[in-house]
């Protein structure tokens, strides 16, 4: 293979008439099939297929180039002879590959002038401890040269979008910059990366909560979800930003409340500062002009990554029909039968156990299925003898309850990850998974699609759904891009070029819908010829087609924007709010009520409460929220069924109880037992008692759909405790995302007693604890720091800043505080 080193220079692409379709009609597919499934393969055949690959990779056809690259990577991994891949990597600017080969595989006997020259040339692509590809370096240069221009960056996972954010923060550190992230988890991850990068001083505040902002500050760095940014824009109607970065910007295309809100804040920010610089970061979008909201006029430059380093291997395991295992080839759109040693296995957990690598992501759509599968897999695996896992289980058991299902899984090297796992637990177990080699499995949902990075060399897809719909081509590619990140492939100690071929296993079994066609699903999302097309649905985007089906929605969105920020829409001739409560509803993002129709009635009811004096207890608060707002919710509004539950007296009592726990600052462990005790009283009063449990339910009641209720009778104590754990998280989210909006409106109207308002919103009236909450700490941790470690924490209430002493972690460890709380501090430092 030394002959390949004579080609280590740039070769122009050859003109050709060969296409993939024509190639399919040659003898090559049969040869390729034997090669890919590792059938007996003569050396002469290897030489043939490598020669064809060398030809394909130099043609002027992207798909054939990719096929040629696929063959070369597979050939080198089969033979462990990486000379050909070295040549390709140098020619195509894939310098992380060429450098890894140079450092890990013996090339000494094949060195010549070209290899020495390439070695020196590659050094200019070194960034810190890593090496960039040619397009990565070009992207960085483009980003730096476009610091004052609005741009869209379309780049797969691992291409350094986090570094681009840090570069922008460095550029705008003395101005006003906001990074919009779609989830709280990504928000905290982004904040921590900015801190660790060292581009800002330790004393510089990073705003993660609207109330951390002070109007007298000349500069600010904010990391916010769109809803929090909307509240910040409301808090100060004069605030402007010099730069906004929209992470995971493809979510802007969707038609839902969050995407509408994202478009709205961009529109408002652009109106306040027409010279604002916008940076859209996304792993996929076909046409960046589709990211432009209405009522904005900025020009958008685009940088799109076109190179490829990874070439996935797709496996299909048919459990439904028992037809065995296949390698799916995305180039020839064909399934090659395999003997993986799993033909007689009938359950998903058996497939995963047998085929698992060192680190594995298992994808499922529903939280209920995630826990069910994780527990089933745990039954097959032995307990792990690891003091760190034992210690982690002890601390999680103390923080939650010892019967927590997660602990059964963790002892077997499994964690699970979904929206009903408490934030502090999720962050802690993610760290365990990243740092402990004994934890091999993470079972997760589409939360992984929102930028969360976890190491993995294999992925198992057990469900073809995302939410209520199917996994789209875009979501599928985003999902599989989370496997074998560059930092793992090219790690100097643990890296492996076999990870250039990430294994994606589609296990077609009981978690797929009954009428699903597994093979067609894989063809639809994995075929190399599948063309990415943007589905532009958000009515606030310029390129969304408006018709009879969405014109009313556009009108609602226009009314919201113009009432929130008057003057945006020229020749506006729709409605304006006429009352204080109507204006407050708009400013607090209430969209479930036709505010313009109902505001007079809402104001009249509010006035009756105002005459009675300020509200200072949870019973009166819930009653006021129901009478003023919930009774006016439109039956067709998104989430109307969840809000309408509050009209039932039992629900009002229940949420009044939850708010009392909030006011009393109950710990998670305390709330679990209070939940269990509350349900026990219901069961004692009525053996047929049913409770609302949302997506964890199995029956309908009170006119509901989608089985959101369940019976208490017949459940074990462990089942009830685990049901309480997920319901507490979901009910807390419901309160924060729904009820607190109405609390804010009542407070805007001066209807709440101040100390009571603080306790409802924050769980405390202590201003120092509130300051820590605004900085992203949990209530239990904030209270602990205030009570026991105040000397290690510098709290500035007027500036909304919290600075931790370097000695804090050691002091907490010395006092044997719960590791979850210690890591939470570490994550916020």
Feature roles, as predicted:
Residues 1-829:
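N-terminal helicase ATP-binding lobe
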């Amino acid at each position: 293979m030394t002959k390949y080193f004579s080609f280590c220079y740039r070769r122009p692409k050859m003109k050709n008439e060969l296409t993939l379709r024509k190639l399919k009609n040659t003898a090559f597919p049969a040869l390729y099939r034997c090669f890919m499934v590792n059938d007996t393969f003569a050396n002469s055949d290897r030489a043939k297929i490598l020669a064809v690959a060398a030809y394909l990779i130099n043609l002027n056809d992207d798909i054939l180039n990719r096929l040629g690259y696929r063959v070369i990577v597979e050939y080198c991994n089969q033979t462990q002879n990486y000379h050909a891949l070295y040549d390709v990597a140098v020619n195509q600017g894939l310098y992380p590959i060429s450098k890894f080969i140079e450092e890990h595989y013996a090339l000494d006997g094949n060195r010549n002038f070209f290899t020495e020259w390439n070695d020196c040339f590659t050094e200019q692509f070194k960034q810190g401890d890593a090496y960039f590809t040619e397009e990565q370096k070009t992207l960085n240069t483009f980003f730096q040269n476009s610091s004052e221009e609005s741009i869209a960056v379309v780049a797969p996972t691992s291409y350094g979008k986090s570094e681009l954010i840090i570069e922008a923060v460095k550029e705008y550190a003395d101005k006003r910059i906001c990074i919009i992230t779609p989830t709280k988890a990504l928000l905290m991850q982004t904040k921590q990366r900015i801190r660790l990068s060292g581009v800002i001083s330790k004393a510089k505040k990073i705003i993660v909560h609207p109330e951390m902002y002070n109007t007298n500050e000349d500069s600010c760095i904010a990391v916010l979800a769109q809803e929090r940014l909307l509240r910040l824009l409301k808090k100060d109607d004069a605030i402007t930003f010099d730069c906004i970065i929209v992470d995971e910007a493809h979510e802007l295309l969707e038609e839902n409340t969050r995407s509408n809100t994202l478009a709205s804040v961009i529109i408002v920010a652009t109106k306040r500062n027409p010279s604002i610089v916008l940076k859209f970061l996304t792993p996929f979008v076909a046409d960046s002009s589709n990211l432009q909201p209405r009522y904005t006029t900025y020009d958008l430059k685009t940088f799109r990554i076109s190179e490829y380093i990874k070439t996935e291997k797709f496996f299909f395991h048919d459990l439904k029909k028992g037809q065995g295992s296949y390698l799916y080839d995305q180039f020839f759109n064909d399934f090659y039968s395999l003997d993986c040693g799993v033909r007689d296995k009938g359950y998903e957990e058996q497939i995963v156990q047998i085929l698992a690598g060192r680190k594995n992501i298992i994808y499922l759509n529903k939280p209920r299925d995630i826990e069910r599968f994780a527990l089933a897999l745990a039954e097959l695996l032995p307990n792990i003898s690891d003091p760190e896992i034992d210690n982690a289980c002890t601390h999680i058991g103390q923080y939650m309850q010892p019967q927590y299902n997660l602990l059964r899984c963790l002892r077997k090297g499994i964690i699970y990850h979904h929206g009903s796992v408490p934030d502090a637990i999720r962050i802690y177990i993610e760290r365990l998974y990243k740092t402990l080699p004994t934890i091999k499995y993470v079972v997760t949902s589409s939360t992984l699609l929102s930028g969360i990075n976890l190491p993995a060399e294999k992925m198992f897809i057990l469900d073809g759904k995302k939410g209520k719909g199917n996994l789209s081509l875009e979501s599928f590619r985003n999902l599989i891009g989370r496997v074998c990140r560059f930092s793992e492939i090219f790690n100097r100690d643990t890296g492996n070029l076999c990870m250039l071929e990430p294994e994606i296993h589609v296990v077609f079994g009981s978690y797929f819908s009954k009428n699903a066609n597994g093979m067609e699903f894989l063809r639809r999302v994995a075929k190399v010829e599948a063309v990415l097309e943007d589905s532009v649905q958000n009515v606030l985007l310029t390129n969304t087609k408006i018709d009879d089906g969405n014109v009313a929605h556009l009108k609602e969105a226009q009314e919201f924007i113009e009432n929130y920020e008057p003057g945006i829409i020229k020749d506006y001739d729709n409605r304006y709010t006429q009352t204080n409560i109507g204006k407050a509803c708009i400013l607090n993002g209430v969209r479930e009520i036709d505010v313009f129709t109902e505001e007079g009635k809402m104001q009249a009811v509010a006035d009756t409460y105002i005459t009675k004096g300020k509200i200072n207890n949870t019973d009166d608060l819930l009653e006021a929220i129901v009478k003023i707002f919930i009774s006016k919710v439109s039956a067709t509004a998104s989430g109307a069924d969840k809000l309408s539950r509050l009209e039932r007296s039992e629900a009002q009592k229940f949420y009044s109880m939850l708010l009392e726990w909030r006011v009393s600052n109950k710990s998670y462990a305390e709330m679990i037992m209070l939940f269990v005790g509350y349900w026990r009283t219901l069961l004692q009063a009525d053996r047929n008692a049913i409770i609302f449990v949302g997506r964890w339910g199995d029956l309908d009641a009170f006119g509901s759909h989608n089985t959101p209720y369940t019976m208490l009778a017949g459940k074990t104590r462990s089942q009830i405790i685990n049901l309480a754990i997920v319901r507490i998280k979901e009910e807390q989210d419901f309160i924060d995302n729904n009820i607190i909006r109405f609390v804010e409106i009542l407070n805007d109207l001066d209807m709440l007693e101040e100390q009571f308002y603080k306790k409802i919103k924050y769980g405390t009236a202590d201003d120092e604890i509130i300051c820590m909450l605004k900085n992203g700490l949990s209530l239990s941790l904030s209270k602990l720091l205030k009570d026991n470690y105040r000397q290690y924490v510098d709290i500035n209430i007027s500036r909304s800043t919290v600075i931790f002493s370097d000695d804090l972690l050691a002091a907490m460890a010395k006092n044997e505080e719960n590791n979850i709380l210690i890591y939470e501090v570490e994550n916020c430092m």
